[in-house]
């Protein structure tokens, strides 16, 4: 999986490009977040094209899978609409690689319904996306109908977008490698028997 481009640039971008329309992102866990280009600007297209060209020069033509999360664990949209953002990110990705598949992490509030709706604006957009339900063994997002679940799309299974059942056994300072065995024993068979869009 290669890196996808969603507009991240260095915080000092204006030292190199005075015309870049950006949104400062502040901090995440005391680390400075990268600045984001506005996807509505012509600068975004220019930088996306350059990013994919340079990445191909470095790695070669090795993959059609690209991971990027524009506002993972927060971030500031600066008034931009999430549907517009995802439409533009996917459009530029497909422009660079007609067979591109955008790998999207389902974590916390991501992907939002608006982000998923933006995929639908691109021809066969959901065919160019694959969602990783990162903590599916404990907190599945594909099953939005369960009690207490947040909505991840207007329709079932991330708006009928292909997705993967993932297990995240070690994160956030948890040093032991273990799983939720009762959930695994029950949920994995349920997923394969009751879902339609698992990849």
Pin down the residues of each PLM region.
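Catalytic-core regions of glycoside hydrolase
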Residues: 1-199
């Amino acid at each position: 999986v290669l890196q996808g481009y969603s507009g991240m640039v260095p915080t000092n971008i204006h030292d190199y490009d005075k015309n870049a329309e950006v949104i400062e992102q502040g901090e995440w866990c005391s680390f400075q977040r990268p600045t984001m280009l506005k996807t509505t600007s012509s600068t975004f297209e220019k930088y996306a094209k350059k990013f994919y060209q340079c990445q191909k020069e470095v790695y070669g033509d090795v993959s059609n899978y690209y991971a990027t999360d524009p506002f993972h664990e927060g971030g500031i949209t600066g008034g931009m609409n999430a549907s517009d953002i995802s439409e533009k990110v996917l459009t530029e990705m497909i422009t660079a690689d007609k067979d591109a598949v955008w790998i999207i992490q389902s974590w916390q509030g991501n992907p939002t319904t608006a982000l998923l709706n933006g995929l639908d604006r691109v021809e066969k957009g959901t065919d160019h996306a694959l969602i990783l339900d990162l903590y599916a063994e404990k907190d599945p997002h594909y099953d939005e109908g369960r009690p207490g679940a947040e909505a991840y799309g207007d329709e079932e299974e991330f708006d009928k977008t292909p997705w993967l059942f993932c297990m995240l056994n070690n994160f956030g300072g948890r040093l032991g490698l273990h799983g939720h065995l009762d959930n695994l024993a029950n949920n994995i068979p349920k997923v394969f028997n009751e879902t339609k869009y698992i990849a």
